[in-house]
């Protein structure tokens, strides 16, 4: 009898233990655990016949992904100068590629019926397959500047304060190239050759950050009657990488001068003929020449002297100065019939400019007109501006 009772007790004990173990195993998944969701899905999808548990993926790749998404730390920029803010916002890396952007500005967009530069616009698209080609209207331009220069509010203030369209157009080209890089070109220009051919093959692209051309090389005693500088670099076509110091300098200069004249009540008094010195090729040329002689960027101890117009007058092929390539007058002004410029079919001809100058009075639109023989005759450029 005793043995029978012992057997019954033992059986009940074994069944109780089995029941408790079974409940514990079934309730385990409801406990919150720190497992990767992807690993949980993989475990559920595993075949029932596989006794080996599926291990969760390692955490290291996840940490690497977080590191790649990190941005530059925000810092207090209130004590910085405009130049320092610009340098922090868009640091310069000469080894990066030239961005595949083409920037232009006009009152209408190319898809509008009254857009009058369809042939010129198409030439840039045709010669630069795969490039992003944007024609920025005035309304888009101000919003773009607000976005790109949110950390440098004085730049936005200066841009909005400029009352003449040509002043804003000049300023915009520097601003968009500094922030995004690529090519800026006036709406009345034709692309003769792709920009991939602008630099000689012997020059490594990772060593150049700015490509410019000569606008004027007036080798004559009375040059100052016709041009602002003895050598004048054009700014109707510019190629650059983001953050280039020349662009940083000219943006700083225009911003300071604009806001200073605004405070003095002189800004509204600027006239069309002041544009060249304020935002145009004169101040652009000055910024470039100063860059060539700046000890912050060049080892002047190895220089043979000051770099000035003498280094560029009469040149017929490209010339490199540090990270800048200067193209001869034929490259961006072919066919003007003066100052050594050759025809548009010359191998060094890259861009043809119609010299539309729609912001100027009609009497001033053709920059190539110059008097000869004491002013009795005038020589006009071969290319004529489209009818206005």
Locate the predicted segments by residue:
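Small-residue hinge/turn detector
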Residues: 170-182
């Amino acid at each position: 009898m005793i043995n029978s009772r012992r057997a019954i007790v033992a059986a009940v004990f074994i069944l109780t233990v089995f029941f408790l173990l079974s409940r514990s195993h079934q309730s385990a998944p409801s406990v919150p655990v720190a497992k990767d969701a992807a690993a949980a899905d993989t475990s559920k999808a595993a075949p029932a016949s596989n006794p080996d548990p599926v291990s969760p993926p390692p955490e290291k790749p996840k940490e690497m992904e977080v590191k790649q998404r990190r941005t530059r730390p925000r810092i207090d920029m209130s004590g910085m100068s405009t130049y320092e803010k610009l340098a922090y916002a868009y640091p310069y890396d000469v080894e990066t590629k030239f961005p595949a952007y083409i920037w232009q500005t006009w009152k209408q967009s190319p898809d509008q019926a009254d857009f009058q530069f369809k042939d010129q616009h198409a030439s840039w698209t045709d010669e630069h397959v795969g490039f992003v080609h944007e024609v920025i209207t005035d309304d888009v331009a101000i919003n773009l500047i607000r976005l790109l220069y949110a950390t440098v509010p004085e730049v936005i203030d200066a841009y909005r304060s400029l009352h003449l369209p040509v002043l804003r157009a000049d300023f915009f080209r520097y601003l968009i190239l500094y922030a995004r890089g690529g090519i800026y070109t006036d709406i009345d220009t034709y692309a003769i050759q792709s920009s991939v051919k602008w630099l000689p093959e012997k020059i490594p692209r990772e060593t150049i950050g700015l490509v410019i051309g000569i606008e004027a090389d007036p080798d004559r005693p009375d040059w100052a009657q016709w041009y602002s500088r003895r050598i004048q670099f054009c700014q109707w076509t510019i190629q650059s990488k983001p953050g280039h110091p020349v662009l940083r300098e000219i943006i700083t200069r225009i911003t300071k001068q604009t806001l200073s004249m605004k405070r003095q009540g002189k800004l509204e008094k600027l006239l069309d003929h002041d544009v060249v010195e304020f935002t145009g090729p004169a101040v652009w040329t000055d910024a470039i020449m100063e860059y060539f002689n700046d000890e912050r960027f060049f080892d002047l101890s190895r220089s043979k002297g000051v770099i000035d117009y003498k280094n560029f007058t009469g040149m017929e092929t490209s010339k490199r100065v540090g990270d800048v390539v200067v193209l001869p007058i034929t490259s961006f002004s072919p066919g003007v019939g003066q100052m050594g410029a050759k025809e548009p079919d010359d191998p060094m001809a890259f861009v043809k400019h119609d010299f539309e100058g729609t912001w100027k009075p009609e009497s001033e639109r053709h920059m190539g007109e110059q008097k000869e023989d004491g002013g009795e005759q005038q020589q006009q450029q071969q290319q004529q501006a489209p009818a206005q």
